[in-house]
């Protein structure tokens, strides 16, 4: 095989001349492919005497190995050049500012709840909570709402069975607190409540905040002063406020509180009243010694008034375009 060395030299030269991976692959096929020059050298072994074939075969295999090693080395070099060129084209300017981190924000209803908790916390109120799956005693009976009261109607309340329901108000926590604590009591109760209603100003689930004070010599004047201070603090302006006589089964006397809107119309914001003597008796508190006041307000409604939102359902639709306005 006098020309084997010449084939190897030509193959190595062709390898070095290849300028990209595609050209290099053509060289591989030309010399090491199924019909390549070096591969065909193996067919010449049958022309040799049997005793010479092993040595000749070893020489051919050595030649093929040299060419393969040259191919591997050239391929690595070409791939490295491609990578370096790409990295050079994608050079990062480390002096540029990094991407701005996108900060989250509190939901507007959560902002309202925390704002109210802060205000009443400074007045000495503690925050209480209770079960959302309630029994009819704590949700109705103990609050002076008898079985025939309209609030127990199926269209207002989500009932599980004859005695269990999704609470329609957080007032049940007031009952539980008065059963467990002796006066003086001063609490607020934020939480989710459920009513079977859905339109532009109502949703089946919404957030409510109850407030309760029970102590000696608590009067309606205390109630009015507390709510005046709260509303002016919450809306951050000297609002015109009025108390309208109303009816709630668990307070007597009862009132609804309105604020004057920017359009010159009165807007209802909450309900309140003096704790009904029957409610105090139901929890073992003597109404001849103690009195108290209670108030309740919808968090979504207050949030709508504070931020000028017109559709309650926007708070529950998870539209980031809407929510990012409150960050």
Swiss-Prot record:
GO terms for biological process: phenylalanyl-tRNA aminoacylation. Mg(2+) binds at residue 252. It catalyses: tRNA(Phe) + L-phenylalanine + ATP = L-phenylalanyl-tRNA(Phe) + AMP + diphosphate + H(+). GO terms for molecular function: ATP binding; magnesium ion binding; phenylalanine-tRNA ligase activity; tRNA binding. CDD domains: PheRS_alpha_core. One of its GO terms (cellular component) is cytoplasm. Keywords: Aminoacyl-tRNA synthetase, ATP-binding, Cytoplasm, Ligase, Magnesium, Metal-binding, Nucleotide-binding, Protein biosynthesis. InterPro entries: aa-tRNA-synth_II, aa-tRNA-synth_II/BPL/LPL, Phe-tRNA-synth_IIc_asu, Phe-tRNA_ligase_II_N, Phe_tRNA_ligase_alpha1_bac, Phenylalanyl-tRNA_Synthase, tRNA-bd_arm. Gene3D superfamilies: Bira Bifunctional Protein, Domain 2. It is found in: Cytoplasm. Binds 2 magnesium ions per tetramer. The keyword Nucleotide-binding applies. PROSITE patterns: AA_TRNA_LIGASE_II. Its cofactor is Mg(2+). Its EC number is 6.1.1.20. HAMAP family: Phe_tRNA_synth_alpha1. Tetramer of two alpha and two beta subunits. Belongs to the class-II aminoacyl-tRNA synthetase family. Phe-tRNA synthetase alpha subunit type 1 subfamily. This is Phenylalanine--tRNA ligase alpha subunit. It comes from Yersinia pseudotuberculosis serotype O:1b (strain IP 31758). The gene is pheS.
